[in-house]
């Protein structure tokens, strides 16, 4: 008779801890962010991206983004425990202590900064550090609790990744990279406001002044619709300056029309769960938009 498989308690504990630390880095969010970093790198150069800034740049930026996410978990641990979307996170569940979580977040950020500073360039290291502070401190610790415009103002930190990718391979700021920042900056409010509509009661419960809580759902739906039009214009900027060609023009136009249509549905159709559908669509919108940017660069550029 086969003996039952017995996993030592210590091994199980290590496995669970590893998963908890990994969850704190918000891997799905970081993965989408790294796509925009990669596209920023590729668009900055006419040919192939050099291996060193590609590998160390992606790794260092990912580590600092994971650090920012972990600090977000730390700062929001009280309200996370009261919201259905986040109550199962490691800190509210007591799977990790505050000290361990802080040590992890701090160490990950320091290692990422050192990696970028020494093996990529100081400019990228400092810009990534500024993004970390912008998200973890300015947005999470202050803006999120202070104003319904938290997403609009704080969105700048989350819009930086393509610029970081650009500077990682060029060691300089460029106007074209800023256009990519503008696109993500404009995309952020309708993306998060759709989620905020879906989770309005939870945000109200923990006194977070998201726009649907302070100004109502209908006003927020109007803002989402208006922002999708603004985003459509922002998405045309790479074409207007000659940075991208017809492949991107067609692809981005289709995606923009899709987002506007979804926002129009949200505003004028009373369909349960539609806000969450808009939120999910916005993720695919950004992902596909940057893929189209990349395809256009190598086919047309």
UniProtKB/Swiss-Prot annotation:
Broadest EC class assigned to this enzyme: transferase
Pathway, per record: Porphyrin-containing compound metabolism; heme O biosynthesis; heme O from protoheme: step 1/1
Membrane topology: Multi-pass membrane protein
UniProt entry keywords in alphabetical sequence: Cell inner membrane, Cell membrane, Heme biosynthesis, Membrane, Transferase, Transmembrane, Transmembrane helix
A GO molecular function held by the record: protoheme IX farnesyltransferase activity
Note: Carbon 2 of the heme B porphyrin ring is defined according to the Fischer nomenclature.
Official protein name in the record: Protoheme IX farnesyltransferase
